[in-house]
C-alpha cells in the first residue's frame, strides 16, 4: 500500500522480516537500511543481508541511546562500541548514520546535543555521514527548530521517527494537520535528506498509523497523496 510512495524504510532490526518487508524491496525497489539498535546487534545478519543485497547503502546507528527504555547508553558506552560498528560499515561499504537522538530520559542527557557532542569528542574518527533524529513535538514549527539545532554538524539530517505525540489528546485530525504542515518543510529544506513517519503500520497507535486493518488509514491516504514527498 505504501510502496509506491516511499523510497526507503527500516524496521529497527538487523535485517528484513521476509513475510512483511520483502515485497517492498522486490516490487518497488525501496531501499532498506539495517540498524545496530544497541550493542547487542547480530553482525552475521547484517553481513548476510548486504551480501544478498549489494544495493544496500547505509547502516543506522543506536536507537535513542539517551532514553532509558531504548538503547540506554551513555556517550562513553556508545563510544566504546562504535569502532566495531564503523569497522563493520567500512568492510561492507556502507555509509554510517549516527545514533538516533531525541530529548531523553537518561540521567544527565535529556539534551541530545550534549549526548552527541560528548560522543563525537570521544570518537572523533567516527565515520558518521548522516545525523539521525527523532521528534514528537506537537507542531511543525517546533520540529523545524529541533532540526535546526543539529545544523552545526554540517551533515545531512534523517528524521527517522516523527509525528505529534504528547501522550494525550491525539486525534486523526491533529495528525493530518501536523503532517500537512510538516511534509512540505521536510521536502524543501536541503538539510533534510530523508524522513520516516511514525508509524507505518498499526501496532497499538490508532491515530498515527498509516496502515490499519490492511488498508490505508485516513492519515495514510494524506501521506500517499502528498508524497511526491518521497524522501
Q: Predicted regions: what is each one?
A:
Residues 3-8, 28-32, 54-58, 90-97, ...:
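Loop/turn elements at helix/coil->beta-strand transitions in domains of secreted/extracellular proteins
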Residues 34, 97-108, 152-181, 198-213:
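Active-site clefts of carbohydrate-active enzymes
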Residues 23-34, 38, 169, 185-231:
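Aromatic-rich peripheral "rim/lid" segments of glycoside hydrolase catalytic domains that contact
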Residues 37-61, 71-91, 110-128, 176-189:
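An active-site-proximal structural segment forming one wall of the substrate-binding cleft
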Residues 53-75, 95-106, 126-135, 159, ...:
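Active-site groove signature of glycoside hydrolases
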Residues 1-59, 84:
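N-terminal carbohydrate-binding/catalytic regions of secreted carbohydrate-active enzymes
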Residues 14-21, 74, 141-146:
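Active-site-adjacent beta->alpha loops and helix N-cap segments on the catalytic face
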Residues 11, 34, 57, 63, ...:
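Aromatic- and acid-rich polysaccharide-binding/catalytic face
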